[in-house]
């Protein structure tokens, strides 16, 4: 299952590298930070799968070949290159040259010795036998209860890759936030321009209305001034008396 998943991840990595090559070589464009984050995340996941799976020279060679095809220097290729570690145990003792003799009593004792033809190769026989103890179970419990040294779960290379991926993700988030703030600033400028234009038009209309009212008041004041200077002002009392007399006559006729 891990091998199938690793093959699928390698196919995805190959597609990403081909797309990146077309972007750099054909379009002459630089990859964005999101592209770098995606590529490094894919490389990190493949490295984890290679470390978990059984050694496979074909998949390792394919991965390193795809890694070499990355066209730009935004990704440190040597940092993501996978090198198979071959563990050799030089102190391993051949089991075929050892024989066991078991003495069965209340407890079981196992003694390991070599043949006579192998004694001349090594003078002393290494102490590989288990000494007899009255309470073997207690000694086993004590050995099991001793704290084991902690094993490193993550290598420095994986830790550096994870930190670099986190930094790139933070950079992409900050870039998206900056773009959002820029769009908000542009929208606020558009709103400001629209409000200013509306206020200017309202002020112009208000000034026109005030000017019209001022002209109307000036005409009315001139008319009143002309009325005050007319002859009707001098004969106004007589006219009022005549109007009152006519009104009285009409009342008398009606009654």
Curated annotation (Swiss-Prot):
Membrane-traversing stretches: 235-255
Positions of S-palmitoyl cysteine lipidation: 238
MF terms in GO: SNAP receptor activity; SNARE binding
PTM characteristics: Palmitoylated by SWF1.
Gene3D superfamilies referenced in this protein's UniProt entry, alphabetically: 1.20.5.110
Keyword set includes Membrane: yes
Stretches for region Disordered: 110-154
Subunit structure: Interacts with PEP12, VTI1 and the SNC SNARE complex proteins.
Protein name: Syntaxin-8
Gene: SYN8
């Amino acid at each position: 299952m891990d091998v199938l998943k690793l093959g699928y991840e390698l196919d995805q990595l190959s597609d990403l590298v081909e797309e990146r090559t077309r972007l750099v070589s054909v379009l002459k464009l630089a990859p964005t930070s999101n592209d770098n984050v995606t590529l490094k995340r894919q490389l990190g996941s493949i490295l984890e799968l290679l470390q978990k799976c059984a050694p496979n020279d074909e998949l390792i060679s394919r991965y390193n070949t795809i890694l070499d095809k990355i066209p730009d220097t935004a990704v440190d290729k040597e940092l993501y290159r996978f090198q198979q570690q071959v563990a050799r145990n030089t102190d391993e003792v051949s089991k075929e040259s050892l024989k066991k003799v078991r003495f069965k009593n209340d407890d079981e004792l196992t003694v390991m010795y070599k043949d006579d033809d192998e004694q001349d190769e090594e003078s002393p026989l290494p102490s590989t036998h288990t000494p007899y103890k009255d309470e073997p179970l207690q000694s086993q419990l004590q050995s099991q209860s001793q704290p084991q040294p902690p094993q490193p779960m993550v290598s420095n290379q994986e830790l550096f890759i994870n930190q670099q991926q986190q930094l790139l993700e933070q950079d992409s988030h900050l870039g998206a936030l900056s773009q959002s703030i820029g769009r908000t600033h542009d929208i606020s400028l558009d709103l400001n321009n629209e409000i200013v234009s509306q206020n200017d038009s309202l002020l112009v209309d208000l000034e026109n209305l005030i000017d019209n009212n001022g002209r109307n008041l000036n005409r009315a004041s001139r008319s009143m001034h002309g009325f005050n200077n007319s002859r009707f002002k001098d004969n106004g009392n007589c006219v009022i008396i005549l109007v009152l007399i006519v009104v009285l006559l009409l009342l008398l006729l009606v009654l």
